[in-house]
């Protein structure tokens, strides 16, 4: 499919996060199903998910003799790690120990070593155990183990890695509130750690791609969080500089975000979105970004209508956006209606209905609801099925303010790209 972003997003996802995307693509005609099955096998063959690998091997008509030996080794290693970490869990499950632990990890580690005989190496075994469980597809167990490890460890690199691991575990077990908490920790880690600019750019790209999971599985709350993150100075700069295809998801988050179109938060996000889409049109385009450009930059209703028809196909073939397709299309039609009414003083309901791919009766209900919801100064003339609109004039002073806002935003983006990236 022309606008499929799978090959753009895969390099920025962990193999376990890629698995649900491959499952989604099966049977959709975008890729050959046998090739997808082989890709799934190749993707997971280095993990500890041996039972599932045996099933995939059979489906592919292969007989991987090494899998049985690998399975036995996984079971053996799991038992060894359980035994090796038992003393750590026994200490952590002691209420007396919990009451003695403080916020200072260095002090805690000294206490655990001197009073309870736990070494740094034993604590680090929790990380290894959590990682092993994760690679076996036991995400809830891995999440719990990594939580305990992170609470005790003073190793910044391992703590950062454990945070990424917990983030993935919570995504894969659909613990969306916890996912957003982990995302906050990751942002703090990426923004505060002493990384060189190139490393920081790459880390932010991973945060952006991983965050698509909770943002589009968490209804309005998720889309709000996406807008807050992606429109922040450092992240919008990253998107524009390194992964402009993410604009597709920003378009959906803004337009299908659930806010009334008259709300100030929606209007601000929409203005910022239009500005960024216009800036990046030579770097990235798809039907969703072109819909925004057609409607708000070119004011071409015919082109916007054509792009909206293509948007539906793109949305329903995108793992992250399929569930938001109906909400996006509904909201996009409302936006088309509002802009159409804004540039006309008299609107023919039949013509507007045709533009929106609605019947005459649907169009009449649509425009009546639009006038009510958007508080337009308008009235319907039933004698000739038209809508008469009264547009208040915008002062030159207000127009200058709006232009200045746009220049200020762009200047800040240019400065941020120069400093941050």
UniProtKB/Swiss-Prot annotation:
Gene Ontology terms describing biological process: eukaryotic translation initiation factor 3 complex assembly; formation of cytoplasmic translation initiation complex; translational initiation
Residue ranges constituting the PCI domain according to the UniProt record: 215-394
A Pfam family per the record: eIF3_N
Compartment(s) where it occurs, according to its Swiss-Prot or TrEMBL record: Cytoplasm
InterPro entries the UniProt entry points to: eIF3e (IPR016650), eIF3e_N (IPR019010), PCI_dom (IPR000717), WH_DNA-bd_sf (IPR036390)
One function term, GO molecular function aspect: translation initiation factor activity
Keyword terms, alphabetized: Cytoplasm, Initiation factor, Protein biosynthesis
Gene Ontology CC terms, in alphabetical order: cytosol; eukaryotic 43S preinitiation complex; eukaryotic 48S preinitiation complex; eukaryotic translation initiation factor 3 complex; eukaryotic translation initiation factor 3 complex, eIF3e; nucleus; proteasome regulatory particle, lid subcomplex
Intrachain disulfide bonds: none
Biological function: Component of the eukaryotic translation initiation factor 3 (eIF-3) complex, which is involved in protein synthesis of a specialized repertoire of mRNAs and, together with other initiation factors, stimulates binding of mRNA and methionyl-tRNAi to the 40S ribosome. The eIF-3 complex specifically targets and initiates translation of a subset of mRNAs involved in cell proliferation.
Classification via HAMAP family: eIF3e
Subunit structure: Component of the eukaryotic translation initiation factor 3 (eIF-3) complex.
Family to which the UniProt record says this protein belongs: Belongs to the eIF-3 subunit E family.
Protein name from the UniProt record: Eukaryotic translation initiation factor 3 subunit E
Annotated organism of origin: Yarrowia lipolytica (strain CLIB 122 / E 150)
Gene that encodes the chain: INT6
